[in-house]
């Protein structure tokens, strides 16, 4: 679907997909719309929202509000990832690895939008299995959330940071 981008204050909002759904009742079908959006500050905070309403603008507005409420902080290393990560949700699997300066965001569809709003500028990624946008977004955010900085790993293992990094 169209990738609509808006900036409100310091937050970057992206519309990933809008879908028309139908509820079948005795008198026929009742149509409504769903919207999937991601919101981030470009500095490591990202959230997604899924809204549903009878009209498209209302669905988008609901999704944006949910995305702002469900933001998580991601530990970035400059403008790339700390280390390679995998994420899984339902039938979707994602793999992301840090890339050198100037690589850009090598990602498709819904994963690209999540990485752009979270502040990642150099990454190599691949989605496996189902490419359902909702599941890909959830898997991507789970993977980013599971990423740990060397300081966190060192503290957990009871070692110094230079011992972790080699």
UniProtKB/Swiss-Prot annotation:
Residues 11-74 form the S5 DRBM domain. It comes from the Bacteria. GO terms for biological process: translation. InterPro entries: Ribosomal_Su5_D2-typ_SF, Ribosomal_uS5, Ribosomal_uS5_bac-type, Ribosomal_uS5_C, Ribosomal_uS5_N, Ribosomal_uS5_N_CS, Ribsml_uS5_D2-typ_fold_subgr. The keyword RNA-binding applies. Transmembrane segments: none annotated. One of its GO terms (molecular function) is structural constituent of ribosome. Keywords: Ribonucleoprotein, Ribosomal protein, RNA-binding, rRNA-binding. One of its GO terms (cellular component) is small ribosomal subunit. With S4 and S12 plays an important role in translational accuracy. HAMAP family: Ribosomal_uS5_B. Part of the 30S ribosomal subunit. Contacts proteins S4 and S8. Belongs to the universal ribosomal protein uS5 family. The N-terminal domain interacts with the head of the 30S subunit; the C-terminal domain interacts with the body and contacts protein S4. The interaction surface between S4 and S5 is involved in control of translational fidelity. This is Small ribosomal subunit protein uS5.
């Amino acid at each position: 679907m169209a990738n609509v981008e808006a900036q409100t204050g310091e937050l970057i909002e992206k519309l990933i997909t809008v879908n028309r759904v139908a509820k079948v009742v005795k008198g026929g079908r009742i149509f409504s719309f769903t919207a999937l959006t991601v919101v981030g500050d470009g500095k490591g905070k990202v959230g997604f929202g899924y809204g549903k309403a009878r009209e498209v603008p209302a669905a988008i507005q609901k999704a944006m509000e949910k995305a702002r409420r469900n933001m998580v902080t991601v530990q970035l290393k400059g403008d790339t990832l700390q280390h390679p990560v995998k994420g899984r949700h339902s039938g979707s699997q994602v793999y992301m690895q840090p890339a050198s300066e100037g690589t850009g965001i090598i990602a498709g569809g819904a994963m690209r939008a999540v990485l752009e709003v979270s502040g990642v500028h150099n990454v190599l990624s691949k989605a496996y299995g189902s490419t359902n946008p909702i599941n890909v977004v959830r898997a991507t955010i789970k993977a980013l959330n599971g990423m740990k900085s060397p300081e966190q790993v060192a503290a957990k293992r009871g070692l110094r940071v230079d011992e972790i990094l080699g």
